């Protein structure tokens, strides 16, 4: 019978894939994120009571990296240069209904990812 809780190996792979997507062209940050993931997984190598919570935490971090992290890059080295955002296909895009109303409360009847 298969367990509904993903394995630590699966969560680790999801985390590595998410770092690859989020930090695609930023090698320094990509390496640092992967080292941090490895350090956290190595520090919880033995299975304990909180192992399922740790696995779920890793999966949640992977989802945040994959869907909510956008990096910006300057078009040139000039201090006044424009910033370009690296938005990929998996970024969660919301609507701007609350901005259009201007100070009035807005009832949002759908999630941002819908």
Swiss-Prot record:
Compartment(s) of residence: Mitochondrion matrix
MF annotations from Gene Ontology: protein folding chaperone
Keyword list, A-Z: Chaperone, Mitochondrion, Transit peptide
Any Gene Ontology CC annotation: mitochondrial matrix
Domain of life: Eukaryota
Recorded coiled-coil stretches: none
Xref: InterPro entries: Complex1_LYR_LYRM7, MZM1/LYRM7
Name of the protein in its database record: Mitochondrial zinc maintenance protein 1, mitochondrial
Organism whose genome encodes this protein: Aspergillus terreus (strain NIH 2624 / FGSC A1156)
Classification of source organism: Eukaryota, Fungi, Dikarya, Ascomycota, Pezizomycotina
Gene name in the database record: MZM1
């Amino acid at each position: 019978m298969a367990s509904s809780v993903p394995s630590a190996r699966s969560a680790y792979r999801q985390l590595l894939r998410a770092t690859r997507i989020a930090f695609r062209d930023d090698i320094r940050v990509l390496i640092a994120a992967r080292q941090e993931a490895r350090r956290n997984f190595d520090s919880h190598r033995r299975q304990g009571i909180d192992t399922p919570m740790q696995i779920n935490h890793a999966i949640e971090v992977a989802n945040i990296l994959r869907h909510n992290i956008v990096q910006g890059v300057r078009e040139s080295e000039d201090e006044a240069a424009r910033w370009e955002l690296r938005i990929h296909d998996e970024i969660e895009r919301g609507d701007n209904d609350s901005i259009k109303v201007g100070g009035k409360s807005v009832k949002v009847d759908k999630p941002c990812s819908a």
